[in-house]
Amino acid sequence: MTNNDAAVEAAGSSRASSSKQQLKLEITEKVRVLCLHGYRQNGEAFKNKLGSFRKFANKYAEFVFITAPHVAKALESAAEPVPEQRSWWANKDDGSFKGTNKGGPAFGFQESLRCVEEAWRTQGPFQGLLGFSQGACFVGLICGLAKKKLTSIRPEFAVLASGFLSGSLVHMSAYEEAISIPTLHIYGQTDEIIPKEMSESLAARFKNAEVLEHSGGHYFPATAQQKQTFINFFQDRLQEYLEHEELQQSGNASFVDSGAEDDNDAEVAAMTAELDESD
């Protein structure tokens, strides 16, 4: 092998190796989760409430919190709405929301769906969704809409705490098909706002559902008792994600190798022509 041949081979090998390395660096080490707060909450307040939970799962997941576009109706008719209290949609004619309400409207839902779709697109990539109370109801609806390809959001897993099926008539079609993505459903035995039977009904719509039932009420639990469940769930999701990325990387690397060989052939031909001319 001449020095020129060796140089050409080294250049091609280096370029292919660099392409493979670039693909490998693009694989993240955490799954990313978009989080939806409950009624009368907002993204920042929800983030603060989940401080302990985030510490448990921080090694495996990154959580991004957004705020609903609608200000919730004031608790008292004569009072002014509180800007920090937000709502994803209203299901009562007076513009308020109640999880147990059946057959009502869904005022503002489409605007909120566009808000989440925009966050999914611009703040992503994301792999999962997490929601609490109204936010968990929303996550369930998004999963159903994604199954029917009626939203641009494509969650690979979801966490639903104190969730429930929406009673709004326009949402009924979202529950027509069973959903197969992995989900973790969290609810309290003494929840008086969203009774556990409502959360169980939501969980029943998912084929691959894991349930974490706690002894408390309407809140997102994050004690030592729940820690291992959270860790195991996100460990599994991260492993699935990395395995999927590795398969994609292998396919892309093969494609890059093929392209590199073609480029090498062209370079070899060019250098050979130059050598012939110098002879």
Swiss-Prot record:
Q: What class of enzyme is it?
A: hydrolase
Outline the segment boundaries, as ranges, of region: Disordered. 249-279
Keywords, A to Z, come to: Hydrolase
The chain's disulfide connectivity reads none
- Known PANTHER family for this protein? ESTERASE OVCA2
Family listed: Belongs to the LovG family.
Protein name in UniProt = Esterase CG5412
Q: Which organism is it from?
A: Drosophila melanogaster
